[in-house]
Amino acid sequence: MMVLLAGRHEQDALSPRGRALLSLSVGFVASVFAGSGFLLGLVREDLHFQCSFHQMGSDDPGSFYCADGISYIGVGVATYGVYGVILLIALGIAMADLKSSGMQSRLLAGISILPIAMFSWSTWYATSSRPIDQAPGANYWIQPLLPVTAVLVTAVIVILAAGLIPRPRLRTAGFRLAMALFVAAALIQPGSLSAVAVTLGTLAAAVCLEWRVPDEVETPTVTSARKPL
């Protein structure tokens, strides 16, 4: 009996749903432990959030004086609170018994965009709410975030376009292309890793669930009505 239960547990763990749940968990853990430090560096050193700009005389080019690390705890709590909610929603979809596996993977692919949207909005907010003693005429968003934003937007467009493809194999190829773009985005701007890791985990879960879909064009079921003879 124990052997049968162990065999069934191993089979469930290696199933597409088991791999999807594992991908979601690994993505969130990587975001917390690998991405939080890079996120703090981006917010503090590049975006100068909660920093003040001071000049000691007319010849001084000026420098930033930022808050200590404890002052940024709120940033982490807010960021990972949102990511945690996204994770719970994704886990619920992955564990749900939906009739259409293709729709299930599409939903996860759509949810994978949410961490990127959160990252984009929060970095915009961090650079838009500037105190009056910041360097005049400076834009702290363009240099650290414009290149990575272009890559992230491209990846999101690929996800949306792939979701419209009826063939599961081609749809999976689109999701994998988006995953490669997200990896490139994290290399361009390591501060985006906190969002990219959650997105990659969710998108990998969508790819895992695609393996349950037959490789054929998905068409709606049409019931033909015949008149009785």
Regions found by a protein language model. Give the residues of each.
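N-terminal topogenic module of multi-pass integral membrane proteins
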Residues: 1-103
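Cytoplasmic membrane-interface segments at the C-terminal ends of transmembrane helices
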Residues: 10-20, 88-110, 155-179, 183, ...
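Transmembrane alpha-helical segments of multi-pass membrane proteins
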Residues: 28-29, 101-124, 175-189, 227-229
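Membrane interfacial helix motifs at helix-loop boundaries and amphipathic/re-entrant anchors
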Residues: 38-79, 120-149, 185-199
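Generic alpha-helical transmembrane segments
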Residues: 81-89, 116-124, 147-159
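Short, intrinsically disordered terminal tails adjacent to the first/last structured region
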Residues: 1-8, 220-229
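Membrane-interfacial catalytic/cofactor-binding modules of polytopic membrane enzymes
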Residues: 106-110, 134-161
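Juxtamembrane/interfacial segments around transmembrane helices
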Residues: 73-86, 131-136, 157-163, 198-210
